[in-house]
Amino acid sequence: MLLAIDVGNTNMVFGLYDGDKLRGSFRISTNSERTSDELGMLIAQYYHFHEISCAETTAVVIASVVPPVMYTLINAIRKYLYVQPVIAGRDADIGIENCYANPREVGADRLVNAVSAVRKYGKPLIIVDIGTATTFDAIDENGAYQGGAIFPGLKVAMEALFLKASKLPRVDIERPENAIGKTTVQSMQSGAVRGYVGALTGIITDIQKELGGKARVVATGGMGRMMAEYCDLIDDVDPNLTLEGLRLIYENNREAFENR
């Protein structure tokens, strides 16, 4: 079986594949203070809960945007799953034309998402990954990764408001029924969610124009489903986009993986 791991700024998401079937997934917080044993035992507990032997894992592929946790994660995988993990973009060819001015600057997760989305949804395409940061990625009609935009995540923006404005409270992120808030909390929620939807709409519209026409818009990330309820330009929501991209990269590089 294949274990695909998406290491994000807030969470690590683990997906266990049996062939092309996602057998199960789980997430834990991204914490650079954990030891490799702590991390390894969390992974082993998940396997035990689902009555899966750690020895059944034959390959591990990782996409990460958090370098400080990689040493610990790699050691945990080696010790508890007995596998040498492969890092997407470093050890395995991601398999998409990258038109960034400096291709090394692009986060591996963004390219992995592109591989997955093009396979599933076609092209041209805009991928909106809504998490700690929100990224917009443009795939042209030839399937090439053209670049995109990076925007602060909604939770990050709300936390900054709480920290910098002494009289404003920390609030849950939800959209009140009315644009005109009748309390401070409602006003903050209205401004945050409606303002964020406005930003999504504006950036997607501008990217559509630069791509030269209508491109399908796919949302993913921790807040992708919530924002899709409010943003009419989002066509699809795919929470497993990155995991599925990692699986595809494994399949495309299977021979190299098996010869490691």
Ranges and model annotations:
Residues 2-6, 61, 125-129, 218:
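Short glycine-aspartate micro-motif
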Residues 2-45, 143-169, 174-178:
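Short glycine-rich, Thr/Ser-proximal phosphate-binding strand/loop in the N-terminal lobe
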Residues 38-50, 199, 203-204:
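Short, well-ordered amphipathic alpha-helical segments that serve as non-catalytic structural scaffolds
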Residues 50-55, 120-122, 210-213:
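Glycine-rich phosphate-binding loop signature in dinucleotide/nucleotide-binding domains
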Residues 52-106, 142-148, 153-154, 182-193, ...:
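Short beta-strand-loop/turn "lid" adjacent to the catalytic site in phosphate-handling enzymes
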Residues 95-125, 247-254:
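Conserved phosphate-binding catalytic cores of ATP/NTP-utilizing and phosphoryl-transfer enzymes
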